Amino acid sequence: FWTDYSPHWKPSTRTSSRSRIDQLLIPHFGELPVDMIARSDINRWRDTMTKREGSFNRTIPIMSVMMQYAEKLGYRAKCSNPCRGVSRFKRELPERYLSADEYRRLGRALANHEFANPFVIPALLLLVYTGARASEIATLRWRYVQIPRLALPDSKTGPKTIYLNPQAIEILSGLDRRADDQLVFPALHREGPINLGEHWIRIRRKAALPDVRLHDLRHSFASAAIAKGIPLATIGKLLGHA
């Protein structure tokens, strides 16, 4: 499946799909023969994902394509896709801006949490300061860093330029620049990009921000500052990044 399908996907799609297969599908279905996976198995998996609704909604299409491919190869009966008819979670995504106190709590959590991967904090701060998507930060390579901008050749909406404010420039300038094709924020114990979602679950728990998603952090912190009346420099200080 991967060999045949992934070459036709954008690099960012390959990265996110590989992560979802490895972290969500293989642990749950990896020991089941492909022809034995039933609708009931998909529904049980859905039941385990009630606190990760967005992840389920983004991953079940991958599972569905894999089942269709198994049918094509003759490993499953025709029209037996167990994902067909399984409903996705309905999600309301209201705008969520952090208050000054919440920025302060987040700053304390970042300062007091010990990360094995030294790139966690700068990656999260860059997400906050740029309003970029988590996937854009995670897959950022040094050749895309052209201060005072990020030149992304492959974002969700196509090529994209992100202009950097002083806080974002300071974050990137504090990192050791490596070869152009290297990731700015690599994973620690495996090949590939950092998994910000995995780290964020622990950080938001420590910061007592259980309802704040990475998607909320990526809202332009300039917009958040306008909505809450908090100066940009003040947000940097609250996050411990003066």
Task: Show which residues each predicted segment covers.
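Short basic/aromatic active-site micro-motif
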Residues: 37, 119-121, 210-229
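Basic, Lys/Arg- and aromatic-enriched nucleic-acid-binding interface segment
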Residues: 53-61, 72-134, 138, 147, ...
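C-terminal flanking helix
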Residues: 22, 64-67, 71
